[in-house]
Amino acid sequence: FEGGKQAVAECYRNIISSGGTPLAITDNLNFGSPEDPEIMGQFVNCIKGIKKACVELNFPVVSGNVSFYNQTDGKSILPTPTIGGVGLIKNISEHTAGKINENDLYYTIGETDTKTTALALLTELSQAPIENVNIKVNLEEEKRNGQFILRLFHEKLISSAHDVSDGGIA
């Protein structure tokens, strides 16, 4: 459930960080055998998470693809929801997102989550995926922060933004 929400929220943040208004997504869902009840449960919960995020963020699914039976020697891959999104930049000639200037100030907007940073570090150090870690996505906060950042872009109060995901802030 949370993995589906996370994938949608990450796409939403990426579009906003480039100064665009999120419009729609396409999904690509990769799972092991649907004949395994645990895998089917993961798939169903992932879709429920994607739906919840899309409804709350007003970010509809317009297309998608599902791939099952992704496994080797009877061992399934980890559930892999991949989300691609499109957004709109109303006036590209005034677009400044991504332009970093020498004297720019840096701000953190929203809550920071040490679990995200710690998870990325632990995965790197162990050189193996860490399973069953459940980092919750606050969709209300995602939407509020996203609208705030877009307003800052539109009012030309910021020239760039970057979302914080896997690696956290260093």
PLM segments and residue spans:
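Glycine/proline-enriched, intrinsically flexible loops and inter-domain linkers
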Residues: F1-A170
